[in-house]
Amino acid sequence: MSNTKHTTSHHMELKRIIILTLLFILIMLIFRNSVSFKMTFQELLPRFYKKNSNSVSNNNRPSSIFSENLVDFDDVNMVDKTRLFIFLFFSFIITIPFMV
């Protein structure tokens, strides 16, 4: 009977490790897609902030919403990374009691 409990316990630990691994893989995939989200955001945002003038010269220049002083997408990416690392750290801290 003790052998059966040991096998069941081992099976549950393995299942828990697999679930945690899949969770972290999912989080990393979401993080990787944030780059594609950023690119899509950069392409879509100027469409909403177009100026009303019909001048040809205004159509050729980039939208003012992307000036360096207004939006810095490198900083946004660093914020995403920081939030992700904080989330992963606390997720790991929370899951430690379940691993023991």
From Swiss-Prot:
It is found in: Endoplasmic reticulum membrane. Keywords: Endoplasmic reticulum, Membrane, Transmembrane, Transmembrane helix. The chain crosses the membrane at residues 17-37, 78-98. It is a multi-pass membrane protein. Its main location: endoplasmic reticulum. GO terms for cellular component: endoplasmic reticulum; endoplasmic reticulum membrane. This is Uncharacterized protein YNL146W. It comes from Saccharomyces cerevisiae (strain ATCC 204508 / S288c) (Baker's yeast).
